[in-house]
Amino acid sequence: MKVSYILALLPLVVASPAPVRPRPTRARQALGLGGLARKAGLKYFGTAIDNVVLDNTQYTSIAFDRSEFNQVTASNGQKWVHIEPKRGVFNYTLGDEIVDPSKDAGQIRRCHTFLWHNQLPKWLTSGNWTKTTLLNVLENHIKHEADYYWGDCYAWDVVNEAFNDNGTYRSDIWLDTIGPEYIEHAFRFARKYTSPGTKLYYNDYGIERVNSKSLAVQALIKDFQKRKVPIDGVGLQSHFTVSRAPLYTDVRAAQQLFTSLGLETALTELDVRLDLPDDAHKTATQAKIYADSVRACVDEKKCVGVTVWDFWDPVSWVPETFAGEGNACLLDAKFNRKPAYYAVADVLTRGAANGTRRGW
């Protein structure tokens, strides 16, 4: 996600607003969200980070604070257009700008993404490929990037957004040249070249409730399991709007499509955008949606964690993509914590108090 691609508006249930709980006191919230998530039984609570804001020291002091965010995702720096801008020429600079400080900070990394229909270099999109030659290009790309980041990634989003909302395969260079089996090839290449123990994910938006798209992903996984194609998890991106968002029960049911098959899940790109200008009612609704989303992960034993798609409003992808919408993140332009932040902290604190499970 971010900057250069546009989501279809999701056909989701209207979420009703609810009063926001009082902000936790300093004594009550000695830990940041990452620390609270661990106590609540999650592996992580993390954030996406984009390279364009790395010169802002106030931003980076939060982004690379393991107590606040104990996991990071490079929102753009590991995508094909940056990693292999020319065929066979690899440039890891943008990825390293996020991976290296996160390693120093002791944070977990979800690496994103080997294969997507967007943010591809021109040499790739304009090439005259056959099925065989394009598969060779794909394998070579995954081999080099996986080798470079060997041991650095808890998980890789191997394939990103392969389905349309109606559950059919998305028409793109991969499908049109290779056929739907390109997804299988990508996962087999990823298992072959990533370090042992790396979790391999399918990642998509619009699958946060049971619908044609999430059922298509489930069918893909069932087929993979029958034929021993490696896959470990499903990422539910979770880009929501204040006016239309799935209910807590929707997100739980969607996760169970995949956890029932033995896979882990994660909320991988959570944000909640609203129509501008903001007001108290919209802010309260946003806080509830954030809280319900995080609670849906805390309450699902095989949900490993939550990643917000950046935490600071000025660098959110939303305003550039959806005219008149914004303020989708946990912190405002002045780095003030919004009601949504405190609502998330409250959910995680309650999860810890309730003895919510599992050690990772």
Regions found by a protein language model. Give the residues of each.
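Acidic-and-aromatic substrate-binding clefts and catalytic sites of carbohydrate-active enzymes
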Residues: 47-60, 80-93, 163-168, 207-215, ...
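Aromatic-rich peripheral "rim/lid" segments of glycoside hydrolase catalytic domains that contact
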Residues: 28-36, 63, 84, 122-123, ...
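Short, acidic/polar
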Residues: 51-68, 135-146, 212-224, 287-296
